[in-house]
């Protein structure tokens, strides 16, 4: 039976980069890793409506820098920047540590081509009881209008309330998962419906690019 590796981890430092960038000793590593998890969980939970694609965290000696990639930056920034200040205050309370925090809000130039936001859109449609084929077709059409070179969407579970769970997928264009220089965006989401949880996987092919580092 074929096993599939995570496309983002498979291409680390080739077409994708680490989303946490810092150095730690063996003793402090677990604590910093837990802090990253708490920060991401908090932002994704509190700013669910902001259309967040990814969160990058970097640290130096006395500063924590959080970069949030979003399709709706206004929701995060808030009026006169009050939203940013609230995030800083909440993160300090969460970490229970006196540290300088910098929040960068980066607007996505092409949100319809982002795998995370595509998966989120499909999950929202399924939770509104839209038929899964219609939801996936709408998402794929939006991605095609955003000029992606290929997209694949898989939905698993009790589709349309069926008694037996199954998986169905749709692909348009090329999605070369075995090509390391292929710029593949990947995301997984869950839709909580009255029939149970549906799993959603999205692969988006944005063309090939020259690796930043040599591939051995």
UniProtKB/Swiss-Prot annotation:
SUPFAM superfamilies: Prokaryotic type KH domain (KH-domain type II), Ribosomal protein S3 C-terminal domain
Listed GO biological process terms: translation
Main location: plastid
Subcellular location: Plastid, Chloroplast
GO cellular component terms given for this protein: chloroplast; cytosolic small ribosomal subunit
Record-level Gene Ontology MF annotations: rRNA binding; structural constituent of ribosome
Xref: InterPro entries: KH_dom, KH_dom-like_a/b, KH_dom_type_2, KH_sf_prok-type, Ribosomal_S3_C_sf, Ribosomal_uS3_bac-typ, Ribosomal_uS3_C, Ribosomal_uS3_CS
Keyword tags: Chloroplast, Plastid, Ribonucleoprotein, Ribosomal protein, RNA-binding, rRNA-binding
Recorded superkingdom: Eukaryota
The keyword Secreted is assigned to this record: no
UniProt domain KH type-2: residue ranges: 39-109
Family: Belongs to the universal ribosomal protein uS3 family.
HAMAP family xref list: Ribosomal_uS3_B
Quaternary state and interactors: Part of the 30S ribosomal subunit.
Name assigned to this protein: Small ribosomal subunit protein uS3c
Gene from which the chain derives: rps3
């Amino acid at each position: 039976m074929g096993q599939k590796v995570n496309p983002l981890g498979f291409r680390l430092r080739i077409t994708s980069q680490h989303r946490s960038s810092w150095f730690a000793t063996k003793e402090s590593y677990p604590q910093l890793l837990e802090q990253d998890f708490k920060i991401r969980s908090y932002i994704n939970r509190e700013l669910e409506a902001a259309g967040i694609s990814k969160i990058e965290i970097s640290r130096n000696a006395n500063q924590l820098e959080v970069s949030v990639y979003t399709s709706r930056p206004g929701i995060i920034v808030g009026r006169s920047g009050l939203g940013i200040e609230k995030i800083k205050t909440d993160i300090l309370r969460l970490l229970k540590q006196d540290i300088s925090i910098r929040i960068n809000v980066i607007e996505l130039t092409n949100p319809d081509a982002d795998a995370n936001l595509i998966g989120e859109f499909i999950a929202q449609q399924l939770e509104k009881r839209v038929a899964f084929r219609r939801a996936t077709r709408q998402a794929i059409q939006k991605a095609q209008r955003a000029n992606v070179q290929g997209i694949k969407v898989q939905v698993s579970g009790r589709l349309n309330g069926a008694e037996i769970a199954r998986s169905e997928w749709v692909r348009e264009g090329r999605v070369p998962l075995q090509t390391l220089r292929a710029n593949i965006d990947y995301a997984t989401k869950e839709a909580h419906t009255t029939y149970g949880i549906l799993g959603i996987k999205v692969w988006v092919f944005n063309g090939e690019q020259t690796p930043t580092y040599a591939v051995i």
